[in-house]
């Protein structure tokens, strides 16, 4: 018997894989939107409920408009991007690769925007050493759901470059100043972000292979059913697939 594979199904296999990738991208965007809304709510609540801490961080306290004006546009962008993705999925249209790279650039710039706004109103080392730079790792982690090695690496590159440029802009950096204001200190932090992007890319490749195997198995099963009729029992289909493997 000739091997039964998804390759003989051609376009249906490619379409099924594309739809799985789009669904994974949709899950990632939904997670990003939820995280951003949660961060905004927590930040606004902390600003109002912890006035003493707010005043210690910034002269006059952290104004309520700051987190809203910083994170609000990114939340709106993410919701719009998610709606666009859903529309394209409903019309069986792919998400252009250039659009995915641009989307990764915009999303990963949120932590940088927060650091920039905070650093312009408080001590730079506080903004750079606080929680906002850690958000880069969340975006790098979620990039695995893009199922593309280079998109994860791109996310790591954007995070690494933005953090290093912000440190140089806010401090600026030197070679022989205080340790936390030196170029090699902050470049090492950026290097970790870049390596995180590479590791996330390897995980994304592994996840994509699992998706490909699942889609290939489903396509082969459908082909067996089409060849021998709808009344073939699942046990017979499994035996045929095992024989052709």
Region annotations inferred by a language model:
Residues 1-24:
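Short, Lys/Arg-rich, polar N-terminal cytosolic tail immediately upstream
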Residues 21-37:
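N-terminal membrane topogenic signal
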Residues 35-140, 159-161:
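Hydrophobic transmembrane alpha-helices and their membrane-interface boundaries in multi-pass
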Residues 45-49, 117, 165, 169, ...:
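Hydrophobic membrane-targeting alpha-helices
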Residues 103-125, 143, 149-185:
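Hydrophobic transmembrane alpha-helices
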Residues 108, 134-141, 190-197, 201:
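Alpha-helical transmembrane segments of multi-pass membrane proteins
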Residues 171-214:
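Alpha-helical transmembrane segments and their immediate juxtamembrane flanks
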Residues 197-245:
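Regulatory cytosolic signal-relay segments
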